[in-house]
Amino acid sequence: KTVFSSGGYSRIIQLQDGRLMAVCESGGINISFSSNLGNTWSSPVKIVTNTNNTPNCVPDLIQLKDGTIIVAYNPRPSEPYTEDRKFGIRCKRSTDNGQTWSDEIFIYDAQHTFNDGCWEPSMLELPSGELQVYFADEGPYTNSNEQQISMCRSFDGGKTWGNPSAISFRAGYRDGMPSPVLLNDKQTIVVAIEDNGWPGYNDFFPTTVRCSLEKNWVHYSVTGESENRDKTLDFNFCPLAKGGAPYLRVLPWGETVLSWQSTYNHGSTTTMFTAVGDENARNFKAMSNPFITNVSDQVMWNSVAVIDTGIVVAVGGTEVLK
């Protein structure tokens, strides 16, 4: 099914009223709704417009327990860079099921150049009502190519946000593209990331970092050598399908499902893969390729959604290369 005829980096959730809601970047941030579990979709509505030579990119969305919908996104200024336009994280809120949206809300700014920017926000609500946004952050590393995963907290449903703290960093490398979940045990936060620091891989590999809900990242960050940093795939059942852009979700019965992009068995182009993990988000296996494409076609910046009674929806940005 086509959700957006143009754009990329799409994510889907199921709302409390049963509808599906999708978001993507396409000359700003667009949303669409489906009332029939994805068979048909409403015409896209643009809720964030690009201004001041600053594209808004890579959105994520969440519905809070109180019904508020939040879309987070990433302003990425275009060249020529100016110090007044920084790479940042922003969000908008809707309290009427997506009909109207708040003004833009500031979360974080990195630096004003591409090499020291921030990227790819993704949100998680905790049982306490605390809302977290995780993102890839080069802002602290102005003298190197390193990158960490940072996280900001909101205690008022996304209206205001605290300062960032690092939750994972492998010295000399680039932890990126976080996708957080709370496991079914309601005791463990797991964040899927891309990690290009595994010895011998010379590429990104889908990885998890984790923390107890009790600790909740307070004065705690996962280092490159930490026992709380794990490769995702079980190589007894899966090939070494290196790649990045992971996305992680929890199934109703506790198992976990991961997507990522890889050139494995796909020539020089990238496609989408998924695998199923256990209730601890470990030992991912049953690897599959949701979109069967020619090796000349790309499926990138993908995600998975879990809807209805546990249906897994693969969401891919397809590009036919001419």
Predicted segments, located by residue:
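Asp-box/BNR beta-propeller blade signature and adjacent active/binding-site loops
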Residues: 1-322
